Amino acid sequence: TLVRAIIKIDSVKSKLIEPGYAYVRITQFQERTGENLAEAITKLYSGSKVPMKGLILDLRNDPGGLLNSAVAVSAAFLPSNALVVYTEGRTNDAKMQLRANPEYYLRGSGRDFLANLPQSIKTIPMVTLVNGGSASASEIVAGALQDHKRSIVMGSQTFGKGSVQTILPLSNNTAIKLTTARYFTPNGQSIQAKGITPDILDEE
């Protein structure tokens, strides 16, 4: 018999391009992406022989994933309590505001993995790379960093997946999937079907 193994793919890859300059790539937003990012940043800082001067965050071809992981990644670079994303929908329970606070990115009562990050990670110059394959959670991060003027966003127009979908059960074991809300960046820009427009357009 075959036993199905649990395969965990690390969604964060990082390296020092040269002393003081870091490159971080996020391939998708999984359950541990926020923790993986915190570990990567800590390692980059300890591995750099000079103070950190800049960081590239690569979200190209990142299809998205978990919303709380997008909030965690944004919170690593933004001031505490900064608005990351909000939703507007047809019903009151479809309206949410998600901020750069542990209550919005921690699942359960785990420790805050962002608490001990170097303070300069919130202020060093930063470039975020995006393209047409950057969707959903990666658009939330790019939009939040752009709106708060925390990072220059560079690349091509993102995919434009900013809808919240709810599955409503019907009779006869069937269900219908409805779009019940949309995601908006902190400055009120709808992501759905529009995407994030980079500050610097570069079609690769």
Predicted feature residues:
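Short acidic, Pro/Gly- and aromatic-enriched capping/linker segments at domain boundaries
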Residues: 172-181
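Conserved functional hotspot residues or short segments at active or partner-binding sites
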Residues: 187-204
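N-terminal low-complexity, intrinsically disordered patches enriched in charged
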Residues: 74, 169-171, 197, 204
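Cleft-lining beta-strand/loop regions that shape enzyme active-site pockets
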Residues: 1-168
